[in-house]
Regions:
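Positively charged n-region of N-terminal signal peptides that target proteins for export
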Residues: 1-4
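Bacterial N-terminal signal peptides
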Residues: 6-17
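HIT superfamily nucleotide-processing domains
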Residues: 19-256
Length: 256
């Protein structure tokens, strides 16, 4: 099976990956790239040729890879992808305390945005997002790592005093999509797993995680302390749940 994955990966042009657009319509494309190319490259001269980072120091079941999205429309975006098979946000293992906190790893990987930009974006200029089951076309879990939209950043800042350790409803562009917002006053995600927080503490999420989208946006509070805004929204028959919409692939927020 492993050799089969390697063979499949060699015929898949990595550079065609564009967000949730599947390569050649293949919803397993990301999985084949990571398992068939990025992981085997480790320990060889080709290391980091395909993925900019692969961490399997704790084994494949707890590892992850970071892949540059090379779509022309996403010049600064990266994707964090587990090195084990996880389809997406609906997988109950993501809320299990024994599962790695992939959002923590994705936040640490924000440094790669700076590599592409030529300058590190400020803490509160970065956003992470995972789309709902119905609003993705790749069936391998991945977190988008990019800049937050400037208008989203502004609205979160303007409403900061209304947020707390309970979920608060807020409409965010584009265009006035309803999100539940949780204010996290910690400068690390080490002690907070967004999947657990949403599935266990957001009303209506438990048992329906496949309909959810989750985003994490860096926050710098009025007192200067860094933290996070955790955002979640639920898909319905009339509304998608595509947290990636909160991202600005052109990174205008950094003054480009």
């Amino acid at each position: 099976m492993f050799n089969k994955l390697v063979a499949l990966a060699t015929v898949m042009p990595v550079f065609l990956y564009a967000g949730d657009a599947a390569i050649g319509g293949n919803p397993s494309a990301l999985w084949y790239i990571v398992s068939g190319t990025c992981v085997p490259e480790q320990g060889t001269q080709a290391a980091q040729r395909t993925c900019v980072q692969v961490d399997i120091s704790q084994g494949l079941d707890r590892g992850f890879a970071v892949l540059k999205d090379n779509a022309k429309a996403k010049p600064f975006e990266y994707l964090l992808i587990p090195t084990r098979r996880i389809a997406g946000i609906e997988d109950p293992r993501l809320a299990d305390p024994s599962t790695p906190n992939y959002f923590e790893d994705a936040w640490e990987a924000r440094r790669f945005i700076g590599t592409s930009l030529g300058a590190n974006p400020q803490w509160d200029m970065v956003a992470l997002a995972i789309n709902s089951m119905q609003d993705r076309s790749q069936d391998q879990f991945h977190i988008h790592i990019d800049c937050v939209r400037a208008d989203v950043r502004t609205k979160l800042k303007e409403n900061d005093q209304t947020f707390g350790a309970q979920w608060t409803q807020l409409d965010l562009p584009p265009p006035n999509h309803p999100y539940a917002v949780f204010r996290l006053v910690e400068d690390s995600l080490a002690n907070t797993n967004p999947f657990q927080l949403v599935s266990q503490r957001l009303p209506g999420a438990a048992g329906h995680m496949g309909l959810m989208t989750i985003a994490v946006v860096g926050a710098t509070f009025p007192n200067g302390q860094n933290g996070f805004y955790l955002l979640a929204s639920k898909a319905s028959s009339s509304m998608d749940a595509h947290g990636e919409d909160l991202i600005d692939p052109d990174c205008h927020v950094v003054g480009r």
